[in-house]
């Protein structure tokens, strides 16, 4: 039961962090790519890799930080929404593919680097 509470609390903080980061980047930068989602997913992927690589032995930490906070910070559903919204009558296949590749390939690379630090 305690792990569910830790995931819930961590997830809440992660979602708040994602919202703040998204608001900041959406007001600060203009881009054809949804840069805020890219940033939170890459940072989250790196931190997940780093946390797993460090093999932190604090019993509550994975539930709170990895599943909770980083699960709330990163967002696959927003990525799916953004990719769907790119499919308009002015659909740009290059933008769509580049954004998809940035998210998935660089996200994996960020996780891999974090794991091996």
Swiss-Prot record:
Na(+) binds at residues 71, 74. InterPro entries: FluC. Fluoride-specific ion channel. Important for reducing fluoride concentration in the cell, thus reducing its toxicity. The keyword Metal-binding applies. The gene is fluC2. This is Fluoride-specific ion channel FluC 2. GO terms for biological process: cellular detoxification of fluoride; fluoride transmembrane transport. GO terms for cellular component: plasma membrane. The lineage of its organism: Bacteria, Bacillati, Bacillota, Bacilli, Bacillales.
């Amino acid at each position: 039961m305690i792990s569910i509470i830790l995931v819930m609390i961590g997830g809440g903080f992660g979602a708040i962090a994602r919202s703040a980061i998204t608001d900041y980047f959406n007001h600060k930068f203009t881009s054809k790519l949804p840069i805020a989602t890219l940033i939170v997913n890459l940072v989250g992927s790196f931190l997940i890799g780093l946390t797993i690589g460090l093999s932190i032995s604090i019993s509550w930490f994975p539930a709170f930080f990895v599943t909770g906070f980083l699960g709330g910070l990163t967002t696959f559903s927003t990525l799916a929404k953004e990719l769907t919204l790119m499919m308009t009558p002015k659909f740009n296949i290059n933008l769509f593919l580049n954004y998809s590749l940035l998210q998935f390939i660089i996200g994996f690379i960020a996780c891999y680097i974090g794991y091996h630090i």
